[in-house]
Regions:
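Long, intrinsically disordered, low-complexity Ser/Thr/Pro-rich regulatory/activation regions
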Residues: 174-210
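Short helix-coil junctions and helix-kink-helix linkers
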Residues: 147-156
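NUDIX/MutT-family hydrolases
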Residues: 81-84, 91-126, 138-143, 148, ...
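Short, well-ordered beta-strand micro-motif
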Residues: 5-7, 17, 83-85, 189-191
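N-terminal strand-loop-strand
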Residues: 1-29
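Short histidine-centered catalytic/ligand-binding loop motif
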Residues: 31-39, 134
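Active-site segment of metal-dependent pyrophosphate-handling enzymes
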Residues: 1, 14, 43-47, 51-92, ...
Length: 210
Protein backbone atom coordinates (compact mmCIF):
# COMPACT_ATOMS: atom_id res chain seq x y z
CA UNK A 1 0.00 0.00 0.00
CA UNK A 2 1.16 3.52 -0.84
CA UNK A 3 0.06 6.64 1.02
CA UNK A 4 0.43 9.95 -0.81
CA UNK A 5 0.41 12.82 1.68
CA UNK A 6 0.15 16.45 0.62
CA UNK A 7 0.45 19.80 2.33
CA UNK A 8 0.71 23.44 1.26
CA UNK A 9 4.05 25.20 1.79
CA UNK A 10 5.23 28.50 0.37
CA UNK A 11 2.13 28.80 -1.79
CA UNK A 12 2.61 25.43 -3.50
CA UNK A 13 1.55 21.82 -3.08
CA UNK A 14 4.17 19.52 -1.55
CA UNK A 15 4.24 15.72 -1.25
CA UNK A 16 5.80 13.77 1.63
CA UNK A 17 8.63 11.38 0.79
CA UNK A 18 10.68 9.01 2.92
CA UNK A 19 14.36 8.19 2.48
CA UNK A 20 15.18 4.72 1.14
CA UNK A 21 18.94 4.66 1.62
CA UNK A 22 19.39 3.83 -2.07
CA UNK A 23 22.48 5.33 -3.77
CA UNK A 24 20.50 5.78 -6.99
CA UNK A 25 19.25 9.41 -7.16
CA UNK A 26 15.87 8.49 -8.67
CA UNK A 27 15.23 5.89 -5.94
CA UNK A 28 16.68 7.85 -3.01
CA UNK A 29 13.22 9.06 -1.98
CA UNK A 30 9.89 7.28 -2.26
CA UNK A 31 6.30 7.45 -1.07
CA UNK A 32 5.41 6.08 2.37
CA UNK A 33 4.31 2.46 1.93
CA UNK A 34 3.72 -0.76 3.81
CA UNK A 35 1.90 -4.08 3.88
CA UNK A 36 -1.46 -4.89 5.43
CA UNK A 37 -0.99 -6.72 8.73
CA UNK A 38 -3.07 -9.66 9.87
CA UNK A 39 -6.39 -8.49 11.33
CA UNK A 40 -5.89 -4.96 10.01
CA UNK A 41 -8.34 -3.23 7.65
CA UNK A 42 -6.99 -1.33 4.66
CA UNK A 43 -8.14 1.93 6.28
CA UNK A 44 -6.23 1.06 9.46
CA UNK A 45 -3.16 0.18 7.40
CA UNK A 46 -3.27 3.50 5.56
CA UNK A 47 -3.62 5.40 8.84
CA UNK A 48 -0.69 3.51 10.40
CA UNK A 49 1.57 4.21 7.41
CA UNK A 50 0.55 7.87 7.40
CA UNK A 51 1.17 8.22 11.15
CA UNK A 52 4.59 6.59 10.87
CA UNK A 53 5.59 8.94 8.05
CA UNK A 54 4.11 12.14 9.50
CA UNK A 55 4.54 11.55 13.20
CA UNK A 56 0.86 12.42 13.61
CA UNK A 57 -2.47 11.54 12.04
CA UNK A 58 -3.37 13.24 8.74
CA UNK A 59 -6.41 15.50 8.72
CA UNK A 60 -7.76 13.80 5.60
CA UNK A 61 -7.21 10.27 4.33
CA UNK A 62 -9.17 8.56 1.58
CA UNK A 63 -8.64 5.75 -0.92
CA UNK A 64 -7.36 7.06 -4.24
CA UNK A 65 -7.43 3.82 -6.22
CA UNK A 66 -5.60 0.57 -6.85
CA UNK A 67 -3.60 -1.08 -9.58
CA UNK A 68 -2.06 -4.46 -10.34
CA UNK A 69 1.35 -5.49 -11.58
CA UNK A 70 4.84 -5.90 -10.21
CA UNK A 71 5.73 -3.25 -7.67
CA UNK A 72 8.79 -3.60 -5.47
CA UNK A 73 9.09 -7.38 -5.82
CA UNK A 74 9.14 -9.82 -8.71
CA UNK A 75 5.72 -11.19 -7.68
CA UNK A 76 2.51 -9.69 -9.12
CA UNK A 77 0.73 -7.59 -6.50
CA UNK A 78 -2.24 -5.29 -6.17
CA UNK A 79 -1.23 -1.89 -4.79
CA UNK A 80 -3.83 0.18 -2.98
CA UNK A 81 -3.16 3.91 -2.81
CA UNK A 82 -4.52 6.41 -0.31
CA UNK A 83 -4.30 10.18 -0.55
CA UNK A 84 -4.08 12.35 2.55
CA UNK A 85 -3.52 15.89 3.75
CA UNK A 86 -1.51 17.46 6.55
CA UNK A 87 -2.17 21.01 7.81
CA UNK A 88 -0.07 23.91 6.59
CA UNK A 89 3.10 24.10 8.68
CA UNK A 90 3.31 20.37 9.46
CA UNK A 91 7.05 19.57 9.72
CA UNK A 92 8.68 16.54 8.15
CA UNK A 93 10.03 14.11 10.72
CA UNK A 94 13.53 12.59 10.59
CA UNK A 95 14.00 10.47 7.49
CA UNK A 96 11.26 12.26 5.56
CA UNK A 97 10.97 15.44 3.50
CA UNK A 98 8.34 17.61 1.83
CA UNK A 99 9.06 17.85 -1.90
CA UNK A 100 7.46 20.56 -4.06
CA UNK A 101 5.14 18.93 -6.54
CA UNK A 102 6.96 20.79 -9.31
CA UNK A 103 10.03 18.65 -8.56
CA UNK A 104 8.23 15.29 -8.57
CA UNK A 105 9.56 14.59 -12.06
CA UNK A 106 12.81 13.45 -10.44
CA UNK A 107 11.03 10.53 -8.74
CA UNK A 108 10.60 7.00 -10.03
CA UNK A 109 7.78 6.57 -12.56
CA UNK A 110 5.71 4.41 -10.18
CA UNK A 111 5.73 7.17 -7.56
CA UNK A 112 4.90 9.87 -10.09
CA UNK A 113 1.93 7.80 -11.28
CA UNK A 114 0.61 7.40 -7.72
CA UNK A 115 0.99 11.13 -7.08
CA UNK A 116 -0.92 11.97 -10.26
CA UNK A 117 -3.73 9.58 -9.35
CA UNK A 118 -3.96 10.98 -5.83
CA UNK A 119 -4.18 14.57 -7.04
CA UNK A 120 -6.89 13.58 -9.51
CA UNK A 121 -8.84 11.87 -6.71
CA UNK A 122 -8.63 14.95 -4.47
CA UNK A 123 -9.72 17.29 -7.27
CA UNK A 124 -12.64 15.02 -8.14
CA UNK A 125 -13.95 15.25 -4.56
CA UNK A 126 -13.02 18.78 -3.57
CA UNK A 127 -16.33 20.40 -4.53
CA UNK A 128 -18.44 18.02 -2.41
CA UNK A 129 -16.10 17.17 0.49
CA UNK A 130 -14.44 19.59 2.96
CA UNK A 131 -10.99 18.57 1.74
CA UNK A 132 -9.52 22.08 1.46
CA UNK A 133 -10.42 22.85 5.07
CA UNK A 134 -8.17 19.99 6.22
CA UNK A 135 -5.13 22.09 5.32
CA UNK A 136 -6.26 25.02 7.48
CA UNK A 137 -6.57 25.77 11.19
CA UNK A 138 -10.02 25.88 12.78
CA UNK A 139 -10.47 29.56 11.88
CA UNK A 140 -9.15 31.27 8.75
CA UNK A 141 -9.66 34.21 6.44
CA UNK A 142 -11.43 33.82 3.13
CA UNK A 143 -8.19 34.79 1.40
CA UNK A 144 -6.42 31.88 3.10
CA UNK A 145 -9.21 29.52 2.09
CA UNK A 146 -9.09 30.68 -1.53
CA UNK A 147 -5.31 30.23 -1.59
CA UNK A 148 -5.69 26.62 -0.43
CA UNK A 149 -8.34 25.89 -3.06
CA UNK A 150 -6.08 27.37 -5.74
CA UNK A 151 -3.15 25.24 -4.59
CA UNK A 152 -5.21 22.05 -4.62
CA UNK A 153 -6.89 22.80 -7.95
CA UNK A 154 -3.70 24.05 -9.57
CA UNK A 155 -5.27 27.19 -11.02
CA UNK A 156 -6.33 30.70 -9.94
CA UNK A 157 -9.91 31.49 -8.95
CA UNK A 158 -11.75 34.78 -9.38
CA UNK A 159 -12.10 36.33 -5.90
CA UNK A 160 -15.67 37.64 -6.18
CA UNK A 161 -16.94 34.49 -7.90
CA UNK A 162 -15.23 32.29 -5.32
CA UNK A 163 -16.89 34.11 -2.43
CA UNK A 164 -20.30 34.04 -4.09
CA UNK A 165 -19.93 30.30 -4.59
CA UNK A 166 -18.95 29.83 -0.93
CA UNK A 167 -22.02 31.78 0.15
CA UNK A 168 -24.29 29.74 -2.14
CA UNK A 169 -22.83 26.47 -0.85
CA UNK A 170 -23.17 27.61 2.80
CA UNK A 171 -19.97 25.84 3.82
CA UNK A 172 -18.42 28.61 5.93
CA UNK A 173 -19.72 30.71 8.80
CA UNK A 174 -18.35 33.97 10.16
CA UNK A 175 -16.87 34.25 13.65
CA UNK A 176 -16.55 37.35 15.83
CA UNK A 177 -12.78 37.30 15.37
CA UNK A 178 -10.72 39.49 13.07
CA UNK A 179 -7.09 39.42 11.99
CA UNK A 180 -4.90 42.10 10.46
CA UNK A 181 -3.52 40.92 7.12
CA UNK A 182 -0.39 42.02 5.28
CA UNK A 183 -1.79 45.28 3.98
CA UNK A 184 -2.88 46.27 7.46
CA UNK A 185 -6.57 45.73 6.80
CA UNK A 186 -8.53 43.67 9.31
CA UNK A 187 -10.02 40.50 7.84
CA UNK A 188 -12.84 38.58 9.45
CA UNK A 189 -12.16 34.98 10.44
CA UNK A 190 -14.42 32.14 9.35
CA UNK A 191 -14.84 28.47 10.18
CA UNK A 192 -16.08 25.45 8.28
CA UNK A 193 -19.84 24.94 8.64
CA UNK A 194 -20.57 21.21 9.06
CA UNK A 195 -23.57 19.77 7.19
CA UNK A 196 -25.77 19.74 10.32
CA UNK A 197 -25.65 23.53 10.36
CA UNK A 198 -26.72 23.89 6.74
CA UNK A 199 -30.18 23.97 5.28
CA UNK A 200 -28.86 22.61 1.97
CA UNK A 201 -25.74 20.84 0.78
CA UNK A 202 -24.92 22.37 -2.55
CA UNK A 203 -21.38 21.83 -3.78
CA UNK A 204 -18.95 24.59 -4.70
CA UNK A 205 -19.19 25.03 -8.48
CA UNK A 206 -15.58 25.50 -9.52
CA UNK A 207 -16.54 25.36 -13.17
CA UNK A 208 -18.06 28.80 -12.58
CA UNK A 209 -14.95 30.28 -10.98
CA UNK A 210 -12.53 30.66 -13.87
Amino acid sequence: MDVVLFTARDGALHVLLVATGSPTPRDRWTLPSGAIRRGESIDDTALRIARDALGTAPTHLDQAGMRGGARRTAQPVVTVAYSGLAPVGTPARAGAAWLPLSEAGALAIRDRDEIDRSIAAIRARIDHQPIAFRLLPDVFTLSELQAVYEILLGRPLHKASFRRSLHAAAIVEATDEWRTERRGRPAQLFRYAPPRRRRHRRGVRFDLLG
